[in-house]
Design a protein with these regions (language model features):
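Glycine-rich, acidic/polar active-site loops that bind/position phosphate-bearing ligands
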Residues: 143-328, 337-340, 347-590
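Active-site-proximal loop/turn and secondary-structure-junction residues that shape catalytic pockets
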Residues: 67-71, 91-93, 121-122, 169, ...
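Active-site proximal loops enriched in glycine and acidic residues that flank catalytic Cys/His/Asp
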Residues: 67, 91, 119, 296-298, ...
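Histidine/acidic residue-rich metal-binding segments in metalloenzymes
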Residues: 13-119, 124-140
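Hydrophobic/aromatic-rich, well-ordered segments within soluble, folded domains that form packed cores
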Residues: 84, 88-91, 307-320, 347, ...
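Short linear, low-complexity motifs centered on an aromatic residue
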Residues: 96-113, 130-131, 229, 236-238, ...
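C-terminal amphipathic alpha-helical interaction region
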Residues: 518, 525-729
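N-terminal hydrophobic targeting/anchoring segments and the immediately downstream early-domain regions
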Residues: 1-24, 141-157, 162
């Protein structure tokens, strides 16, 4: 019965590492080979066009339609030399992936033949039929027009035979239908607010960048085994499967030697990533078996987001070439760690100052403390929203599930930085005033040696940890678009820095120096945002109670957490910064609720199918064999002897009967519960119904299936088991 399972397991065991081509050049030589970067722009564009385009990229100058044709023509020439025949606007709709529609360069030449053509108009703007992308009701199908517009701040690149142009995607009436539009607006708002604050310390600052360095965790599974698991195939996670006797308890996988087959995949992936200009740097085994991590050197946030989207699709492609499937789902396997995507985030200026790194002088440290405290304030004020920004049906399996970050946002600072803030909190104006007066810039700010901070104790349970020169937002899901978290965080920072500037300006007077005013405001903030600081164990029960006392958002229901986007403080934050309108927020929430419902719905269907046509039949078949055995024993032996010999089997027969009955009944109940939920019109209420009634049933049914897996004859079991999925290379 399960010959397929044994065949795929055997094949997976025997699969050798694949060959792949290693470039003859060094990485520094092939880095960015397929990217139209500055070097290429310089080579393929006329001098004046190059200068104008650089102005557009660096200073956000408007794109002069006069140069668009020449830019497009240069791009086309470069792309065609690499073998490209098509181009596409590449955008990030409100699904977890990217979207593209390829058009060939060909046009009629007017003489009955064809020619390669790519105009500025096609580069700059297009109108893909947008009606089938999630839009939360912003457009009805009869008003399907939306358009994509080039984002010159992210360079175009070639994948296979296609020139890919990063674009934003908006409705005809201007509402954003993607992740990039609000991200660019958030970055612009943050830049403006942060530059203003920087001017307290350095009037020459012109621009503040938001930096993002993501760490991408993922699982690899042999593709034959993957294909034999319909749940993995259709939902990205295993909906059933008993824990293997050995999983991660020995902690022997973390940083262990990378298996040869996996190493080949990683090398191939890295080469292709570098060719696409993604500066990948770090790779290692993660905690769980078959779990790995990949991290690049951090980049400007918008580019880093694009690169993460690109690498996720590259990973899928390269994995298949190596006979693997990559699992980006946050929780593919029960009982072992899930995958996250730590978002390392910091701010830095155009003149090279890292705003979240301690400095050497008191003045530098005042600036450092200013940005740290404002970050804490932003996170404190919007902790519920930040949680909503990383929440999804899939990431819900990680959050609060006694691993990875808890479902409460708090920030870990480490002993040293905590002490500095505590010290500032209790200091008085007099301390400060005297010192400022006497020594000019010599403020009473403790020296903070950079090295020490860099080695601060790590707290793996903290969802938002300070790590020396950046904050690490760990709660982001492995499958998510980083933009969601980055939009919320940078917008919160924009609002907070704007408020800070206003507060400091108000506090300054003839008697109160700028430094004193800054310290006064910071001291107040340190007191206000104290509830967000937590250095203890984020997984503990005590913390849940304590966090509730502190007034932090402790909600655990995914669809209810989404409400945070529509709270008064969130709407004020997004609208005052010009990042999103109320209509956009409402539409996006509709998409979130709908997506949530659909994901649970699909899981429920798949589990129902598998239960009824894999598990119950196999269990029943095994049960029949046992029954047969019981009868045969009766024929061979006298009644009392046969009874004694059959006792074990009879209890197994009973257990199988009970569990299969339970499974059948609950699959029926789940269908009924879906019918009830599906009749609810309100998308939010429907999502809540799916969360409250259907999601728990998945777990209950699974429980009995996993118990059956332990007693049914291994020969008969059709689905590859955890021990096979997780330990084969
Ligand atoms: P760890 O696992 O110790 O957190 P990794 O090396 O796996 O460290 O990843 C750290 C990530 O943080 C990398 O992507 C790195 O580029 C990024 N990073 C380092 N410094 C900064 C910074 N100042 N701002 C943003 N990201 C940073
Ligand atoms: Mg990290």
């Amino acid at each position: 019965m399960s010959s397929l399972r044994f065949r795929v397991v055997e094949k997976a065991f025997q699969t050798k590492a694949r060959e792949f081509s290693i470039p003859e050049e060094r990485p520094s030589e092939y880095f960015g080979k397929y990217v139209f970067n500055r070097e290429k722009m310089f080579k393929y564009l006329p001098g004046d066009v190059f200068a104008k385009l650089v102005d557009v990229i660096d200073n956000g100058a408007a794109l002069d339609s006069g140069i668009a044709d020449e830019v497009a023509s240069g791009m086309k020439r470069w792309a065609m030399e690499l073998g490209a025949t098509h181009y596409t606007h590449w955008f990030q709709p409100l699904t977890e992936g990217t979207a593209e529609k390829h058009d060939a360069f060909v046009e009629h030449n007017g003489k009955g033949g064809m020619m390669e053509e790519f105009s500025g108009k096609l580069l700059v703007q297009q109108e893909p039929d947008a009606s089938s992308f999630p839009n939360g009701g912003i457009r009805n199908t009869f008003e399907a027009r939306g358009y994509s517009a080039w984002d010159p701040s992210s360079p175009v690149f070639v994948v296979d035979d296609t020139l890919c142009i990063p674009t934003i995607f908006i409705s005809y009436t201007g509402e954003s239908l993607d992740y990039k539009t609000p991200l660019l607006k958030a970055l612009r708002a943050m830049n403006k607010a942060a530059v203003d604050v920087c001017h307290y310390f350095d009037p020459s600052v012109k621009k503040v960048f938001s930096y993002l360095g993501w760490e991408q965790e993922y699982f690899l599974v042999d593709e034959g085994l993957y294909a034999a698991r319909p749940d993995l195939l259709l939902t990205g996670r295993t909906l059933m499967g008993h824990e293997a006797s050995k999983n991660q308890q020995l902690e022997d996988h973390y940083f262990g030697a990378i298996p040869i087959r996996v190493a080949a995949f990683m090398k191939d992936l890295e080469i292709q990533a570098l060719e696409l200009g993604i500066p990948v740097k770090t790779r290692h085994n993660e905690v769980a078996p078959n779990q790995f991590e990949l991290a690049p050197i951090y980049e400007e946030c918008n580019l880093a987001v694009d690169h993460n989207m690109l690498i996720m699709s590259l990973m899928r492609k390269v994995a298949r070439a190596h006979g693997f499937r990559v699992l980006l789902h946050e929780k593919p396997f029960k009982g072992i760690n899930g995958s996250g995507k730590h978002n390392n985030w910091s701010l830095g200026t155009d003149n090279g100052i890292a705003l979240m790194a301690p400095g050497k002088t008191a003045e530098e440290n005042l600036r450092f403390i200013t940005f740290i405290v404002n970050t804490l304030m932003a996170v404190y004020r919007h902790n519920g929203l930040l949680k909503a920004s990383i929440m999804s049906a899939t990431n819900a399996h990680r959050l609060g599930a006694n691993e990875a970050p808890p479902a409460i946002i708090s920030s870990f600072l480490g002993t040293q930085l905590s002490q500095v803030l505590d010290h500032l909190e209790v200091s008085t104006d007099e301390d400060m005033g005297v010192l400022v007066g006497k020594h000019g810039m010599k403020l009473d700010i403790p020296q903070i040696p950079e090295l020490l901070i860099d080695n601060t104790d790590r707290n793996r349970t903290s969802p938002f940890a300070f790590t020396g020169n950046r904050f690490e937002f760990r709660a982001v899901g492995s499958e998510a678009n980083c933009a969601s978290a980055m939009i919320a965080l940078n917008t919160a920072m924009a609002e907070q820095l704007t408020d800070f500037k206003r507060d400091v300006d108000e506090a300054m007077s003839d008697d109160v120096s700028k430094e004193t005013a800054i310290l006064q405001v910071l001291r107040r903030y340190i007191k206000t945002c104290k509830p967000i600081r937590f250095d203890g164990n984020g997984y503990s029960e005590e913390w849940k109670a304590e966090a509730a006392r502190r007034g932090l958002d402790c909600e655990t229901s995914c669809p209810v957490i989404f409400d945070n986007y529509l709270s008064e403080s969130s709407v004020r934050m997004f609208t005052s910064t010009g990042v999103m309108t109320k209509v956009e927020l409402e539409a996006r929430n509709e998409v979130k609720w709908e997506t949530y419902t659909k994901k649970i719905q699909i899981e429920a269907r798949v589990l129902g199918d598998l239960a009824m046509n894999h598990i119950v039949p196999v269990a029943t078949h095994y049960q029949s064999m046992l029954i047969n055995n019981v009868y045969r024993l009766k024929e061979l032996f006298d009644a009392s002897e046969a009874e004694g010999m059959s006792a074990e089997n009879i209890s197994l027969i009973r257990e199988i009967a009970e569990r299969t009955a339970y499974i059948k009944k609950h699959v029926d109940d789940m269908v009924e519960a879906r019918k009830v939920a599906n009749r609810i019109d309100n998308v939010r209420e429907k999502a809540i119904a799916y969360h409250d009634t259907i999601a728990p049933m998945l777990e209950q049914i699974r429980y009995h299936i996993d118990k059956l897996e332990l007693i049914v004859d291994d020969q008969m079991w059709t689905l590859p088991k955890y021990r096979e999925l997780l330990f084969i290379r």
